């Protein structure tokens, strides 16, 4: 096999084989080495060059420089998870390069954590406010369940029917329970102690 002779534009002036180093068209990351036969007037394949990349270094990808004139080592964090310092959302890194801006490798400990520039700090006011909102929703759920448990008794009352002693006792117990649930202090959330629904 004859070796190809190329001009300054990397076009073959004499047909033959040439070793090229291929890279990804988007990330410019080194992919492989191949031997190509070039006929006269044919250039090297797209996304390839003639200069060999350096040896592999742990934690780095070998990529073509932005001007395509040389190889460079680019940090390779692929497979790592980073967290947005704005929202706390996680994202897996899928391309070579530095960590994206406004991210950290430190995971937030709660949905209420805010980044202070160095670490996550829990926004206790937001956390407490969310706990109070959840307690208020729990209050309404308990009241709804209690009301559902006496719906037949309410229907009898609306129809003007007389209640048995057991039904009257049950109705009063559930109404007392609803009063107790309504009076429960949710400002201590998430440590709210709810009253027990009376047995049917």
Curated annotation (Swiss-Prot):
InterPro entries: Phage_T4_Gp38_tail_assem, TFA_Chaperone
Domain of life, per lineage: Bacteria
Family: Belongs to the tfa family.
This protein's name: Prophage tail fiber assembly protein homolog TfaE
Organism: Escherichia coli (strain K12)
Lineage, broadest ranks: Bacteria, Pseudomonadati, Pseudomonadota, Gammaproteobacteria, Enterobacterales
